[in-house]
Regions:
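Ribokinase/PfkB-type carbohydrate-kinase core domain
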Residues: 1, 5-167, 171, 197-200
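Conserved post-catalytic alpha-helical subdomain immediately downstream of the catalytic base
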Residues: 172-201
Length: 201
């Protein structure tokens, strides 16, 4: 199977991005491809739900196959982490939500959080902090075991399993220092996971 790839086109004046994605081999990734018996890793990060056709498909238990992979990773002693993709569809509740009880740390942007919870966050207008907090808590109530981490242009909000909210404002950089926003969510997730790995929290 061909390698998966994504071409990102950014409109120069508005910085609006368009993604052209080819699933390639990622569509064929299946539960049997994962062996956690000999790993010494602390964290298993799975991304992106909604782009992994075989793992997004329902397994024998009626949940997406990704749930079984995450369950086995957790049973092997790994902290599980998941990121999903901003897809314009109604699949968030059928593919992502059933997996959440197997997730220790969830990453979602404002669009994805709205799709998962049905709570409008004020995207593109003025972010509603109360709604963001409610959405983060709702994701924990849907099953996320440790942290539901939401990120958006204005910053980030994380909700712990105890319902505690942690807020972080976005960093303001000079426009000349910003080459683009492609990968911003991935960089955010990497930073949070590094902090968890190093036991900063």
């Amino acid at each position: 199977a061909p390698t998966s790839y994504t071409d990102v086109m950014t409109e120069q004046s508005t910085r609006r991005r368009t993604f052209f994605h080819h699933r390639g081999a990622n569509a064929l990734l299946r539960p049997e491809h994962f062996d956690f018996s000999r790993t010494c890793a602390k964290i298993f990060h799975l991304g992106y739900l909604l782009l992994l056709d075989a793992l997004d498909a329902n397994g024998e238990d009626g949940r997406p196959c990704a749930a079984d992979v995450l369950r086995r990773a957790h049973a092997a002693g790994l902290r599980t982490s998941v990121d999903c993709v901003s897809e314009h569809s109604d699949r968030f509740r059928s593919v992502v939500a059933p997996v959440l009880p197997e997730v220790d740390v969830l990453f979602a942007n404002d669009f994805e959080a709205e799709k998962l919870t049905g709570i409008l966050l004020g995207r593109g207008v003025e972010l509603d902090r109360r709604a963001v907090g409610a959405a983060a808590r709702a994701l924990v109530q849907l099953g996320v075991r440790e942290w539901a981490c939401l990120h958006f242009p204005e910053g980030a909000c994380a909700c712990s399993s105890a319902g505690e909210l942690v807020w972080q404002r976005g960093v303001r950089l000079p426009a000349a220092d910003v080459a683009g926003t492609a990968g911003a969510g991935d960089a955010f997730a990497a930073g949070v996971l590094y902090g968890l790995h190093q036991e900063w929290l």
